[in-house]
Amino acid sequence: PVIPVSFKLYQNFPNPFNPMTNIKFDVPATPQSSGKENVILKIYNVLGKEITTLVDKELSPGTYEVNFDGTIYPSGIYYCRMSFGESATVNKMILLK
């Protein structure tokens, strides 16, 4: 398997989605890591309120996928925020029912 060289949050697919979407991300190997890094992936609504945490654990370098089920949430814009060490990135997602 190929080990990612950079931290990356891919755009969710499909987008817009109803009710499920797939979120893929890369956890790189870093010189300062002891083999695993804590990764946090959370979903926020358009007002910036956290609605769920999809990932909050130490992960080995590699590519991962998680699913977000928007069944209980209203249509609208949501943000997927991934943090890894000192880095963070955000993608916009649209739930369209």
Residue ranges and their predicted role:
Residues 59-63:
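Beta-propeller and related beta-repeat scaffolds in trafficking/envelope systems
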Residues 1-13, 17-42, 65-68, 84-87:
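Glycine-centered coil/turn sites that cap beta-strands in beta-rich domains
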